[in-house]
Amino acid sequence: MTSTHMDKTGDGAGRKGFVGLVIGAVGVVYGDIGTSPLYALREALRPFAADGVHEAEVIGLISLMVWTLTIIVTFKYVLFLLRADNDGEGGTLSLLALLMKKMGRNVPVLFFAGLIGAALFIGDAMITPALSVMSALEGLKLITPAFAEYVPLASAAIMIVLFAVQSRGTAAVSKLFGPITVLWFLAMAAGGVIHIGDDWRILAALNPLTALSFLAHAGSVGLIVLGAVFLTVTGAEALYADLGHFGRRPIQMAWFVLVFPALLLNYLGQGALVLAHPEAATNPFFLMYPDWALLPVVILATMATIIASQAVITGAFSLARSAVHLGFLPRLRIKFTSETNTGQIYVPSVNLLLLVGVLMLISSFGDSESLATAYGISVTGTMVISTMLAFQFLRAVWGYSLVVAAVLLLPLFIIEVLFLAANLLKIHDGGWVPVALALAIMIMMWTWTRGQAYLKRLRANNEIPLDSFIRSIERKSDHSPVTVPGTAVFLTSVPDRTPNVLLHNLKHNHVLHEQNVILTVWTEDEPYVPDSRRIKISQLSPRFVRLDITFGFMDDPDVTRALALCRESGFKFEIMKTSFYLGRRNLVRTPNTGLPGWQERIFVVLEGFAIDPSDYFNLPSNRVVELGEQIAI
């Protein structure tokens, strides 16, 4: 995946670079939505299969699909949300960070909306690979029915290999993602063009009144099929999430020039095929292609679904990194798999979580038809959340009035809530799976955030004010600690309080360095912070300095590199003569404290997953001194 921090439009690299970004966006941004034709119409026709499909049902469903793509993807994402960026970055957490910056962090509705949206995305990242790959491999059943029983095993094998190679990075093969996916969209468009002429009545689906008429006459079945119709736009959130990787204009160009026309042609072709041959409703996508082309199309479909899965996995890694930097998750181990591309990352714990989840889904559901019933809830939930956040964006950032913002987004919100209601009807058929996954992840993030806030309050109340400590320690007396040469850096999250690790060092070692740095690392509610704003140095006394280092939530928090910038500000020290003092906290559960018992247990478990600050902040391991402390929670 090409993953560089682009300007807000993405057209800063010249014509050749722009074309490259467009092709790259096709592979990464549109991989997921490009695999929806494999199963969307098949699932939408399922409620009508018993009585046989009729003309009005086929045309009505295709019309719903066409206009769902038009309203939700084209209008909401391509034309509107791609402009609602946070310094060029998109996605639920990026939008949440921007709103927290404008409105403050203490807005519970915004906070929980962001957590729910992020949690739903992780659930989607488990379902998408399982459903997409199984749907592609099931095309082989048309070549030989004997392959049917091997679909789950083959799907699991592909997933194991895909997740196993994540640690090596995907920079080398990602150059092929765009061209392969372009070929996939062209193949879909060709299949549609070949069959539209099977029954020209399908063109009536281009009239939005056809969709409305179908819903008006479908009764309760109409609400049921909306859940399947929504499968056409699964993956649309990737348009917004990958905004920072490719820029707005390449994503828009890819949609209007290739992706949208190919999807429209394919869905219209599937609809015409079913009108002319109702028996094709069992698998309209693969039945569009002649026998000689079936195997190549299945192979191409499998490659496209693997690429779509890779895009979702990469998105989950990026979301996890943002969640860590924003304080929603503990410090996770994040490996950079490219020396030149900071977007190429690997998060081992998230990778393992996704792999286990995907394999459980494949073994539990067994085929794409069963798993499709579980799909949709996480995606619709994420879209509803993004619309709610977009409403606040219009008000807080663009300054729109309540009435104007409501007029623009209320119709869209109502449509998405209807889709969510339709998908919630599938709770008992497996729809509970993404809900349970999202709930578990949201509880983890909420617990971690609440626990961290409690510990910060605890430290602020119990620790000695830093200015009082410095005044006391700088007074010359017979009890003054021994001064030793060199620099000591003490990490703390509460800069106006004396770090416990500093007090422990004085208590046990009875020494104070010539130069003592109270270091606090901050994460801004913006994706990237320039080096000009990276550091702030405040001289507190002859021997004490306060140093604030600021990163964006998409930056690599490399403290060692940031310290090198201090020399440019006249603050000189040698890294190999500097000792970094870190507090290793040992949480002890006690009754009647700040967290309920169940949250205490979860918080302690999450604390165990956090990596050492020395690793997270890239501190030289041979210069780090850790002192333990017990904290009652």
From Swiss-Prot:
Keywords: Cell inner membrane, Cell membrane, Ion transport, Membrane, Potassium, Potassium transport, Symport, Transmembrane, Transmembrane helix, Transport
Topology in the lipid bilayer: Multi-pass membrane protein
Reactions catalysed, as given in the entry: K(+)(in) + H(+)(in) = K(+)(out) + H(+)(out)
GO molecular function, one term: symporter activity
Chief location of this protein within or outside the cell: membrane
Keyword Membrane: yes
Localisation per UniProt entry: Cell inner membrane
Pfam families registered for this protein in UniProt: K_trans, K_trans_C
A cellular component term, taken from the record's GO annotations: plasma membrane
Highest taxon, organism lineage: Bacteria
TM stretches of this protein: 18-38, 61-81, 107-127, 145-165, 176-196, 211-231, 255-275, 293-313, 345-365, 371-391, 402-422, 427-447
Its job: Transport of potassium into the cell. Likely operates as a K(+):H(+) symporter.
Family the UniProt entry places it in: Belongs to the HAK/KUP transporter (TC 2.A.72) family.
Protein name: Probable potassium transport system protein Kup 2
Source organism phylogeny: Bacteria, Pseudomonadati, Pseudomonadota, Alphaproteobacteria, Hyphomicrobiales
Chain's gene name: kup2
